[in-house]
Structure formats: structure tokens, C-alpha cells
Amino acid sequence: MVDSKKNKKQQVTDFSNLLSQSKGFVIFDYSGMSAVDATLMRKKLFNKGSKIKIVKNNILRRALKTSNFEGVDESVIKGKIAVAVGINEILETLKVVDSVVKEKELMKFVCGHFDNRIFNSDDLQKIAKLPGRNELYGMFLSVLQAPLRKFLYALQAVRNAK
């Protein structure tokens, strides 16, 4: 009994430290996910610099309290819960989880936390549709290049007209 209590306290401490070091996290219900799906998701998240943890609900509640994420509504933490933790980039983590949630109809977002805000499942689905940082850089560069490209085409047309 004592070992079990120490083990649970250690789990809370470890998970709380992980949450505190992260850029954000997404809590989702993994009811419809098979072991193969979980392994694939874990690999995708690892490649993005993120982690997935399946924890007991009470351990998650206590870890959220000890790491000062008190805005999360505890009533939504029920059932089979997994947490995707974004160590480097939370948006990429959210996109990976969203792609799996779309494939598996039984899975659903519960809530998430990043940028010092709590997001519900609807907000997370909307945010997941936004382009990533690299995509935005590409869009921005194409906007910058367009006038220059058109100017060069105009110069080429003038040159060909002579």
C-alpha cells in the first residue's frame, strides 16, 4: 500500500514536471484507438518533438493542480483520457492528434492548454485547421515574391517586344 502511494505521488510529480516544461498540451478521449493506432500516433508525435501519455484521471487532475493549470474543468476529465504534450511546438502536436481524431470517429478532443489559455474541443478543432508556422512562412514569402515576379515578367515582355 505504501509503495503504491509513493508510486502514485511520483507519477503525479513526473507528469506535473512534464506539463510545466511543455509549450502546451491537448487532452483527448482515446476510446476508439487501437494499439496499432496508438503506436503510430506516438511515432508521429515523437517526430514532431512531442509526447503522448495515457494517465489515470486522478493523476491527471492532481498533476494539473500542482503545475498550476487550474483553469481546466475537472468535470470533463472522465473516461479513457490521453494527453499529448507539445514539448517544442504545440500546433504541430494538435494537428497530429486532429488527424487521428478525424480518422477515428469514437475519439474526441476534451480540452487543451497553450498560450496561457484553456481551449474546449470546438476551439481545438478550429485551431487545428490553421496553417502551421512553416506554411505561413511559405505564404508570406510567396506574397513578397509576387510583385517582383510580375515586374520581371513585364521587363521580359518589353524586351521581347523590341
Swiss-Prot record:
CDD domains: Ribosomal_L10. One of its GO terms (molecular function) is structural constituent of ribosome. SUPFAM superfamilies: Ribosomal protein L10-like. One of its GO terms (cellular component) is cytosolic large ribosomal subunit. Keywords: Ribonucleoprotein, Ribosomal protein, RNA-binding, rRNA-binding. Pfam families: Ribosomal_L10 (PF00466). GO terms for biological process: translation. Transmembrane segments: none annotated. Forms part of the ribosomal stalk, playing a central role in the interaction of the ribosome with GTP-bound translation factors. Part of the ribosomal stalk of the 50S ribosomal subunit. The N-terminus interacts with L11 and the large rRNA to form the base of the stalk. The C-terminus forms an elongated spine to which L12 dimers bind in a sequential fashion forming a multimeric L10(L12)X complex. Belongs to the universal ribosomal protein uL10 family. This is Large ribosomal subunit protein uL10. It comes from Mycoplasma genitalium (strain ATCC 33530 / DSM 19775 / NCTC 10195 / G37) (Mycoplasmoides genitalium).
